């Protein structure tokens, strides 16, 4: 039905007959001559319909946007002055000899070149939305990335092995999606949050190097970078050290970027310990494009009269930091007020600041309502540690460490991505990858009064920290590593526990008793007793990687049929009710939703 794609018709085909198939992107009637921009996945070509072929011309008169067409004609050069340098086919046009309407279209609900559509409209009419050139580009980029990953891993001796989609519920992380079993009444499968345990058992089975590009499922509240079902590049290896694993997959990401986008990432990614990342940036996924970082002031603020600073400085788990913004004294009071409201989102009670007008004058060269509350030694230490220069502004965070890290880390990004930062060289438009390593093994859950795994409970502690599993879990450092790119964690992995006695100690540190561990993870504990090899791996979020490469606002723009932030598919209207017969077969009875009790009306005078 065609000899070429529309976007591949160029001047090299001048004088040749072509058969094209595609959609009417736009139809124009110019003085009795009809022009149709014919579109397919490769691009557009201009089709000219002259009235000297009456039968064909009559068909052209009835064509409307999104009609599916077949065109037969001759490639000719466009008249002088009518070429379009923005199109690959912009120097030629096709003189139509035969025009067939393969299928008409009702009037589309929107123009495909409308850039102001709501996401609801786009997802409801996803079939049409996917015809848009940007969406075609995004999904083809996704395909190219996946193919480059496969090529690289195949060349490195990895084997693509599928693991089950129906598995056992082990609710240690996000909520599982549960699937009721019809055959085993009252029992449930879970959709996998990752193939973690299966890939570890494949290592025990001797497969040595495994990968798959697979769907994973998590029933969690959604954000711009989350979906209930997402695609993971999942990898595991045996007999490689942590450094060897990182080197292997660092090269994979370099290869993917080079071969799909002609982007050369750093020859060697920098490596930063978790502790350093939190100290300098308040985040374990720092965006290194932003040239701002924290100045630690906790110890220097212990004896000041300003309780906003001295309180957290003397409290266990408190922190005081400054964020120096070079040239920031030019920010208006309105800018500062906006930043103050912004940090309140993250739990900060306010945002102290000092404008540095003239460093040499000390206290007298500073502009701020808080200067009067700080003694000279404290002011001198702030200026010295921060490296403040004339014309700078210093923002301060003082609270519990988590609040300071969250609020000031977010402020760093907010300021760093602003027009002000971009115009003053505080933001570098580049690809900035790094590894973050040496994560804490555990973090303490105050609500449940127990330790929880920072990554997952199958991550190995550093060899020298094994003793802390039973004496002081908070001191344990894990053999875990994240690959971070421009402030996004695109991959995370670890060296795994491969000895049963160590895995059991980790479960006990997590307050998972031997009986519960046996019930939930007995298959793993048994497998580890059969000469399990040292192994480790990593998983990359394909959706996130492609989102970054495409410059998209959301991962929904790189997934063909995504869910909304309410976990709904607006195209198919899923999820949806099912009939009573299906529920009976699954041994399920629905309870009526509990009515919400209305709040009592306020009394009126």
Curated annotation (Swiss-Prot):
Q: What Enzyme Commission number(s) appear in the record?
A: 6.1.1.23
Q: Where is this region: Aspartate?
A: 196-199
GO molecular function annotation: aspartate-tRNA ligase activity; aspartate-tRNA(Asn) ligase activity; ATP binding; nucleic acid binding
- Supply the alphabetized keyword list: Aminoacyl-tRNA synthetase, ATP-binding, Cytoplasm, Ligase, Nucleotide-binding, Protein biosynthesis
Residues under site feature: Important for tRNA non-discrimination:
30, 81
- Disulfide linkages recorded for this protein, renumbered to the chain, are none
The residues that hold L-aspartate are 172, 218, 455, 496
* UniProt key word Protein biosynthesis: yes
Instruction: List the GO biological process terms.
Output: aspartyl-tRNA aminoacylation
Does the record carry Thylakoid as a key word?
no
Q: Which EC class is this protein assigned?
A: ligase
* Entries under CDD domains matching the protein: AspRS_core, EcAspRS_like_N
- Give the binding site residues for ATP: 218-220, 227, 489, 541-544
Please name the Pfam families in this protein's record: GAD (PF02938), tRNA-synt_2 (PF00152), tRNA_anti-codon (PF01336)
InterPro entries according to UniProt: Aa-tRNA-synt_II, aa-tRNA-synth_II, aa-tRNA-synth_II/BPL/LPL, Asp-tRNA-ligase_1, Asp-tRNA-ligase_1_N, Asp/Asn-tRNA-synth_IIb, AspRS_core, GAD-like_sf
The Swiss-Prot or TrEMBL record describes its family as follows:
Belongs to the class-II aminoacyl-tRNA synthetase family. Type 1 subfamily.
NCBIfam families associated with the record: aspS_bact (TIGR00459), PRK00476.1 (NF001750)
| Subunit structure as annotated in this protein's UniProt entry | Homodimer.
Function according to Swiss-Prot or TrEMBL: Aspartyl-tRNA synthetase with relaxed tRNA specificity since it is able to aspartylate not only its cognate tRNA(Asp) but also tRNA(Asn). Reaction proceeds in two steps: L-aspartate is first activated by ATP to form Asp-AMP and then transferred to the acceptor end of tRNA(Asp/Asn).
Name of the protein this chain belongs to: Aspartate--tRNA(Asp/Asn) ligase
Task: Give the species.
Answer: Ralstonia nicotianae (strain ATCC BAA-1114 / GMI1000)
* Taxonomy of the source species: Bacteria, Pseudomonadati, Pseudomonadota, Betaproteobacteria, Burkholderiales
């Amino acid at each position: 039905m065609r000899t070429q794609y529309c976007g591949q018709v160029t001047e090299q085909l001048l004088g040749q007959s072509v058969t094209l198939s595609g959609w009417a992107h736009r139809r124009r009637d110019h003085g009795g001559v009809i022009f149709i921009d014919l579109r397919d996945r490769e691009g557009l070509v201009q089709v000219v319909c002259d009235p000297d072929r009456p039968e064909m011309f009559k068909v052209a008169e009835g064509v409307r946007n999104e009609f599916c067409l077949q065109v037969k004609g001759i490639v000719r050069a466009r008249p002088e002055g009518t070429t379009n340098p923005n199109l690959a086919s912009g120097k030629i046009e096709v003189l139509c000899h035969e025009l067939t309407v393969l299928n008409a279209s009702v009037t589309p609900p929107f123009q495909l070149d409308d850039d102001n559509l709501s996401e609801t409209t786009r997802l409801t009419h996803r079939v049409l939305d996917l015809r848009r050139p940007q969406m075609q580009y995004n999904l083809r980029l996704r395909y190219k990335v996946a193919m480059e990953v496969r090529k690289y891993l195949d060349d490195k001796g990895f084997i693509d092995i599928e693991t089950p989609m129906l598995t056992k519920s082990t609710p240690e992380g996000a909520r599982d999606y549960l699937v009721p079993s019809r055959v085993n009444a009252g029992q449930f499968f879970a959709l996998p949050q990752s193939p973690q345990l299966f890939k570890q058992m494949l290592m025990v089975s001797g497969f040595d190097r495994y990968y798959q590009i697979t769907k994973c499922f998590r029933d969690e509240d959604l954000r711009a970078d989350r979906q209930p079902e997402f695609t993971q590049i999942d990898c595991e290896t045996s007999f490689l050290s942590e450094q060897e694993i990182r080197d292997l997959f660092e090269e994979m990401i370099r290869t993917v970027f080079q071969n799909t986008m002609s982007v050369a990432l750093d020859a060697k990614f920098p490596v930063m310990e978790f502790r350093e990342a939190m100290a300098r940036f308040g985040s374990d996924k720092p965006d290194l494009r932003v040239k701002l970082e924290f100045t630690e002031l906790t110890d220097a603020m212990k004896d000041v009269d300003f309780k906003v600073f001295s309180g957290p400085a003397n409290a266990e788990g408190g922190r005081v930091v400054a964020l120096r913004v070079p040239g920031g004294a030019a920010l208006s009071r309105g800018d500062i007020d906006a930043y103050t409201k912004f940090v309140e989102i993250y739990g900060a009670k306010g945002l102290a600041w000092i404008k540095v007008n003239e460093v040499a004058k000390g206290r007298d060269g500073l502009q701020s309502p808080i200067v009067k509350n700080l003694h000279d030694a404290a002011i001198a230490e702030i200026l010295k540690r921060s490296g403040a220069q004339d014309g700078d502004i210093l923002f301060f965070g003082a609270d519990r460490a988590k609040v300071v890290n969250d609020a000031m880390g977010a402020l760093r990004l907010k300021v760093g991505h602003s027009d002000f930062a971009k115009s003053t060289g505080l933001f570098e438009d580049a690809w900035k990858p790094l590894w973050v390593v040496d994560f804490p093994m555990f973090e303490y859950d105050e609500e449940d009064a127990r330790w929880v795994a920072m990554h997952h409970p199958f991550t190995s502690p550093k060899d020298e920290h094994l003793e802390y599993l039973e004496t002081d879990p908070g001191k344990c450092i894990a053999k875990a590593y994240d690959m971070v790119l421009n402030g996004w964690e695109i991959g995370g992995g670890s060296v795994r526990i491969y000895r049963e006695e160590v895995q059991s100690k980790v479960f006990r540190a997590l307050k998972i008793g031997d009986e519960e561990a046996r019930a939930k993870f007995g298959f793993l504990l048994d497998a580890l007793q059969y000469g399990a090899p040292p192994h480790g791996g990593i998983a990359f979020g394909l959706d996130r990687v492609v989102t970054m490469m495409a410059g998209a606002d959301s991962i929904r723009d790189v997934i063909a049929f995504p869910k909304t932030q309410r976990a709904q598919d607006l195209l198919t209207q899923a999820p949806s009710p099912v009939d009573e017969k299906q529920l009976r077969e699954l041994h399920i009875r629905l309870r009526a939703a509990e009515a919400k009790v209305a709040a009592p009306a306020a009394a009126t005078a």
